[in-house]
Design a protein with these regions (language model features):
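N-terminal signal peptide c-region/cleavage motif recognized by signal peptidases
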Residues: 19-23
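Bacterial N-terminal signal peptides that target proteins for export
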Residues: 1-10
Length: 272
């Protein structure tokens, strides 16, 4: 009887361990232990992101001069840091926290060592059919791919959001966003190492301030890398039809619409 009981216990234990193993493999988005367990170790820290963000917000006067959220992801899409520029988490649009993470994920997911694409560059390409564009954009449907992991985006203690211990840190949030504010990060070897996303104002201001944050972090080493902006010194810059675009009164190609208090994209610093 004792031998039979022991065999039953061992068999049950084996089944439980197998189930746990399968669950761990099927839920590979969980289990990271902060930023030190992944590719975040070579990217800016929370403190560095916060400092770069506050400086960028202060330096830019486009949009409505609102406070911002910023997120950095590594090359695997793992969130490394989340920060805000205001006095507390309620000083900027609460919904923009997840949007900033979506933008970072998008810019990382669709940029390469040889091709930098900002989230602003994707706006027209994902549009459906219309009178102005009877055939629709060449990437229509992209915005519905790679959905946000809602457990990562909305889980954890709300009091920790935007701090060093933001619940998204160490996890892959996913998501696709197709207006300005997301930029890939390039190291001194001109290799893409992750991406940055900003949200909290007009999408044009989001792009401008993300551009300044990337420069402040020293991760704008993409001179000579391919892009769709038509400006080799700013490969992944935002494109507006009436300023640096096709000037055909249609938002098409790689353009996105202008915003309130829009500035000329060529006024942004050239990349390195």
């Amino acid at each position: 009887m004792q031998k039979t009981t022991l065999i039953q216990i061992l068999a049950t234990s084996t089944i439980l361990l197998s189930a746990l193993s399968v669950h761990a493999e099927s839920d590979g988005n969980r289990g990271y232990v902060g930023r030190n367990a992944n590719g975040c170790k070579g990217l800016p820290s929370y403190e560095q992101l916060k400092s770069a963000l506050v400086s960028a917000v202060a330096a830019d006067s486009t949009g409505f001069n609102l406070n911002m959220w910023a997120t950095i992801v590594d090359r695997d899409g793992v969130v490394c840091a989340v920060a805000f520029s205001g006095a507390d988490r309620g000083s900027q649009w609460p919904g923009s926290r997840v949007i900033s993470a979506q933008k970072a994920n998008t810019a990382n997911a669709f940029s390469l060592d040889g091709l930098a694409l900002s989230t602003a560059n994707l706006y027209s390409a994902v549009q459906g059919t219309s009178d102005a564009s009877p055939l629709g954009g060449s990437l229509y449907g992209l915005q519905f791919s790679n959905p946000v992991d809602t457990a990562v985006a909305y889980g954890g203690n709300p009091a920790a959001v935007g701090t060093k211990f933001d619940p998204m840190v160490g996890n892959r949030v996913g998501g696709i966003n197709v207006f300005g504010g997301g930029l890939a990060l390039y190291n001194s070897s001109k290799k893409v190492v992750g991406a940055l996303g900003l949200s909290g104002d007009t999408s044009c201001a989001d792009h401008n301030q993300a551009w300044l944050v990337r420069k402040n972090l020293g991760l704008d080493n993409l001179a000579g890398i391919g892009g769709v902006s038509g400006d080799a010194t700013r490969p992944d810059n935002i494109v507006y039809d009436s300023i640096n675009g096709n000037s055909n009164n249609i938002t098409d190609g790689w353009e996105q619409p202008i915003c309130a208090n829009t500035s000329n994209p060529t006024s942004l610093p050239a990349v390195k």
